[in-house]
UniProtKB/Swiss-Prot annotation:
Cell division factor that enhances FtsZ-ring assembly. Directly interacts with FtsZ and promotes bundling of FtsZ protofilaments, with a reduction in FtsZ GTPase activity. The keyword Cell division applies. It comes from Escherichia coli O1:K1 / APEC. Coiled coil: none annotated. Interacts with FtsZ. HAMAP family: ZapD. Disulfide bonds: none annotated. This is Cell division protein ZapD.
Length: 247
């Protein structure tokens, strides 16, 4: 059985931001619990990058707009024969609840910005080797606290992002499920099509091909060029089958 590799590519700035936030939040929990310097730096570096992303745009505003848009889309299915009405109603209520929590939450990331330890580490992350014990004795002593004490603090930091995480997860799940995968074929390593106002491209490609896609474009039109992983000896077949969803 062939192994399929999923590639996702945003077709607008809001989706690019959402995917980056999703990626960084996922990275926060990869190396938990924090037991050493390496795990701590991985965690704090991702926190710092998250805060940088938050400061660049209106994340809350865009998410609230999308939660409302998804509710309107679901409402068009109310009363349609053959559609699970209880499921539609449940999703609409979940979207409303996520929006209410998000709109009443403090400024996104504010709890993390105001934390003294996070602020100290952020100041040193851009300096090569800047998080040594003599540079950051605060972090050094924190790593020697009882594990349960560190775990509790980390859980509190992550929980402060719950209003955002809940809303973002719902939005991205609905967008990803909005379009099915369809078989497509590239010619000489190239494929292009109309986006149809899509926000996100999802592409399944066989690992056996040892190829990856370079995607460019926007919601109205996009192009995909397939490139060999081995840039010197790899080859791109004249015809290449893959699966594509325009969400």
């Amino acid at each position: 059985m062939q192994t399929q590799v999923l590639f996702e590519h945003p077709l607008n700035e809001k989706m690019r931001t959402w995917l980056r936030i999703e990626f960084l939040i996922q990275q926060l929990t990869v190396n938990l619990p924090i037991v050493d310097h390496a795990g701590a730096l991985h965690f704090f570096r991702n926190v710092s990058e998250l805060l940088d992303v938050f400061e660049r745009g209106e994340v809350r505003t865009e998410l609230l707009k999308e939660l409302d848009r998804q509710q309107r889309k679901l409402q068009t299915w109310i009363g349609v024969p053959g559609v699970d009405q209880s499921r539609i109603e449940a999703l609409i209520q979940q979207l409303k609840a996520a929006g209410s929590v998000l709109i009443s939450a403090p400024r996104i990331g504010q709890f993390l910005r105001e934390d003294r330890l996070i602020a100290l580490v952020r100041q040193r992350l851009s300096i090569p080797g800047g998080c040594c014990s003599f540079d950051l004795p605060t972090l050094h002593i924190w790593l020697h606290l009882p594990q349960a004490q560190r775990d509790s603090q980390v859980e509190t930091w992550i929980a402060s992002l719950n209003p955002l995480t809940q809303a973002l997860t719902m939005v991205l799940d609905l967008i990803r499920q909005s379009a099915p995968f369809r078989k497509q074929t590239s010619l000489n390593g190239f494929y292009q099509d109309n986006g149809g106002d899509a926000d996100l491209l999802r592409l399944n490609l066989s690992l056996d091909s040892q190829l990856y896609p370079q995607i460019s474009g926007h919601k109205s039109r996009f192009a995909i060029r397939f490139m060999p992983l081995d840039s010197e000896n790899g080859q791109v077949p004249e015809r290449l089958d893959f699966e594509l969803a325009c969400c």
